[in-house]
Amino acid sequence: MSKNIYVKETYEWIRVGNGENELTEIEYEKLLKYLEKNNDVLKSNIIDIKYKKLRFINYVGIICFENVILEILPKLSLSDNLVKDREILLQMLSICNKIPITMNEKIRLSLKNYNLLNFFVMYFIESMQTQMKKGIYFEYINKIENLNVMRGKILLSTYAKEKGISPMKIRCKYDEYSENNFLNQVLKKACISILCRINDNSIQGKIKKILSYFQNVDLIYIDRKKLLDYKFYKNNDRFKDCYLLARLLLLNLSMDNSQNNQEAFSILFEINTLYEEYIGILIKSIWDNSFRETYIQDKSKFLLKNEQTGKKNFNLRPDIVLYDLKNEYEIIIDTKWKAIEVDSNVFYRSSDIYQMYAYITAYENAKRCILLYPCIQKDKNYSSWKLSESFKGKFIDCLLYTSPSPRDRG
């Protein structure tokens, strides 16, 4: 039986001990070994290590090793509700098109019973079951073989060059309507990977039943580029959700190992980037109309102009710029995935304020520059600064974003 540990990114430490939410000495060393081994994939500042404890910085998701499933969640709810934080994280991933999942009541209820890994796997299984009832996917596969009878097109030029071919054989090129295609090979590989890694009798039973449909599909090494570049059309579109979930699992579970014998694996998302993208999509959906536009990572402005060369230097790139073309003004928003307040002490980084000052002075029509932090405490107001008279009517504000429940978003 798996051991489940839940922690909040940045806010909670994983400790060595015998408690319910603690790691043994052996488990702790296994985790450190995995993180060290994957240091080229994960950014170096992912962990903060102290004596017999560590915490994760800027990454959320799951890490599985030995019999441990470690779930790292962002602190998004004001009530410290694990299920709600998990729910809002999935909503963020869904809106940002990181996962092919649309939140509904059935999914919300399942989050009470499943960690993130089992949730992804169960959603994949249910999607596969739905499509398998309609039948496995077939497509025409281009094949070249030496045959006893003519089929398709005869390849005389290649036949003449090859040695050792029986004179009774014919070199043919033809199309075969087959289930042994790349899409099915990916789905089968994902099922095998799940079977090797998820120690749950119910899940294993369902996966084995799905695999019975793929007996004539080869188990192959899946090329990463080919996996990422696969296209969908009218005939294969019904398998899109299944494929995208299989891709998510394969990219993290087994892409570097065709023998399925990894000791550990992870599915992690960089929360700072995810938060920025999520806020951008939400604001764009509210702000944009016929005379208002939202620009993400706008690169139109520079801080300085070089007197010798005449070239502009030091490109500014605010996270979000809101343009009002009718009233000719701009609002600049920079998202910050960090706590503005720790132990009742408010911390404004001077570098952040200087950055906002550079933005609001470079954008001539900018009225407000907003530092947007996640809200972790109710009913709090933070500073607003007015610029000097030479920049009349310009303000820098610190505001908080409170994540609504996905129910509130419909």
Predicted regions and their residues:
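Extended, gly/pro-poor, charged amphipathic helical "stalk/hinge" elements that serve as dimerization
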Residues: 251-266, 275-281
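Nucleic-acid nuclease catalytic cores
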Residues: 336-337, 344-351, 357-390
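Residue(s) in the substrate-gating loop at a strand-loop-helix junction
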Residues: 22, 30, 41-257
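Active-site beta-strand-loop-beta-strand hairpin of nuclease catalytic cores
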Residues: 65-69, 321-332
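Conserved small/polar residues in nucleotide/adenosyl-binding loops
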Residues: 401-410
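Short, contiguous acidic/charged loop-to-helix segments that flank catalytic cores in large enzymes
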Residues: 268-270, 303-312, 338-351
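Acidic-basic catalytic patches of nuclease active cores, encompassing PD-(D/E)XK
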Residues: 17-43, 268-301
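Active-site metal-binding core of divalent-cation-utilizing nuclease and nuclease-like domains
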Residues: 45-61, 294-327
